[in-house]
Swiss-Prot record:
Molecular function terms, GO-annotated: DNA-binding transcription factor activity; transcription cis-regulatory region binding
PROSITE patterns: HTH_ARAC_FAMILY_1, HTH_ARAC_FAMILY_2
Identification of the protein by name: Urease operon transcriptional activator
Lineage, highest ranks first: Bacteria, Pseudomonadati, Pseudomonadota, Gammaproteobacteria, Enterobacterales
Stated role: Positive regulator of the expression of the urease operon.
Length: 296
C-alpha cells in the first residue's frame, strides 16, 4: 500500500493511461475535467475518486482559486491488500446494492471521515522511525475507514471492485441473472454490469471452462427446477419467471436436457421425496445445442 501527496500551483494535464493498482484519491482546490474508464467527471469542488485496478484515467485540471494550490492525496493498494480490508468490511455491509444502474460511480464529495484520514496520513507519513510494518498498519486502518465512509454515501464498493478481486466470473454472472431472471440478458449487458468489456469477460469465462450461453441456460434451468419442486406455480408461470422466451420453448429445452417434461419432473420430484433428486437429475442432464432464443 502506498500513500502520496501532491501540491501544485500549475495546470495538471495527464493523457490517458492505465493504473496498475486500485486507488482512492482526494482532490481539493481544483476545477476541470477527469475521465475514468470513459466516464467524464466535471470537477468544480473537492472530490473523492474511487478507481478500480486497470482503469484508464486522464485529466485536465487547474487551481480553483489563484491564491490556493490544488492538493491531491492518493492511496493505492494491491489486490491482496484491498481484499484483506474487504474481509473486515463485509460483515458490516450488504452483499451488494440492488441493480438500479449498470453505470459505475467513480466519484463523490469527500465525506468528513475521508478528509480526516487523508489528513492523518499526510501528517504522519513517513513515520520518523521508518517502521514499514507500522506504516502499513496505519494505511490499512485509514483504508478501512475511508472505504466504509464511501460505502455509507451509497457507493457499492463491493460491486465496483468485484470484477478484479471478488468471486469467479461465472458466480458473479449467476448472481446478476438470479436478481433479474426475466431480463433478456446479453453478454454486453453483463459486461457493462461488471464494469468490463465483453471480450475481457469472455476470456475470463473461457478460463473458467464455461460459455456465457451455457451459463445463462444453466442458471435459468436451476431456477426452474427449484420452482417446479418447491412452488405451486404453473409451468407457464415458471417459464416466464425464469426468463424463457415462451412456454413451448421452455418445455422443449427442458425435455431435451432432462429427458422428461417439466410436469413429469414435478410429479417425480414430489413422489420421490428425495432431497438429492435435483442434484442427481442435473448430473444426468444432456448438453443442449443452442438456438436463437439464447443469444449472446
Amino acid at each position: 500500500m502506498e500513500y502520496k501527496f501532491f501540491l501544485s500551483e500549475s495546470q495538471m494535464v495527464l493523457k490517458a493511461f492505465y493504473i496498475e493498482s486500485a486507488m482512492i484519491a482526494m482532490l481539493t482546490g481544483a476545477k476541470g475535467n477527469i475521465v475514468i474508464n470513459g466516464q467524464s467527471i466535471e470537477i468544480e469542488s473537492d472530490v473523492t475518486l474511487i478507481i478500480p485496478k486497470y482503469s484508464q484515467v486522464s485529466c485536465n485540471i487547474v487551481c480553483n482559486t489563484v491564491k490556493q494550490p490544488l492538493e491531491l492525496h492518493t492511496l493505492s493498494m494491491s489486490a491482496e491488500e484491498l481484499q484483506a480490508v474487504f474481509l473486515l468490511l463485509k460483515t458490516l455491509m450488504k452483499s451488494g446494492a440492488p441493480l438500479t444502474s449498470h453505470q459505475p460511480i467513480y466519484h463523490i464529495s469527500p465525506p468528513e471521515t475521508v478528509r480526516d484520514n487523508f489528513s492523518l496520513l499526510k501528517q504522519c507519513l513517513p513515520l520518523k522511525k521508518q517502521s514499514a510494518s507500522q506504516e502499513a498498519l496505519l494505511m490499512k486502518q485509514s483504508l478501512y475507514f475511508i472505504l466504509m465512509a464511501i460505502y455509507q454515501e451509497g457507493i457499492d464498493i463491493l460491486n465496483l471492485f468485484r470484477f478484479n478481486y471478488d468471486e469467479p466470473k461465472n458466480q458473479a454472472i449467476t448472481h446478476l441473472i438470479t436478481q433479474e431472471p426475466q431480463k433478456k440478458w446479453h453478454l454486453d449487458d453483463v459486461a457493462k454490469a461488471l464494469f468490463t468489456t465483453p471480450s475481457t469477460l469472455r476470456r475470463h469465462l473461457n478460463r473458467e471452462g464455461v460459455s456465457f450461453r451455457q451459463l445463462l441456460l444453466d442458471v435459468r434451468m436451476g431456477m426452474a427446477l427449484n420452482y417446479l419442486t418447491f412452488s405451486n406455480y404453473s409451468v407457464f408461470q415458471i417459464s416466464h419467471r425464469c426468463g424463457f422466451g415462451s412456454n413451448a420453448y421452455f418445455c422443449d429445452v427442458f425435455k431435451r436436457k432432462y429427458n422428461m417434461t417439466p410436469s413429469q419432473f414435478r410429479l417425480q420430484s414430489r413422489q420421490s421425496n428425495d432431497p438429492n433428486f435435483i442434484t442427481n437429475l442435473s448430473l444426468r442432464s444432456n448438453p443442449i445445442e443452442f438456438d436463437k432464443e439464447i443469444d449472446e
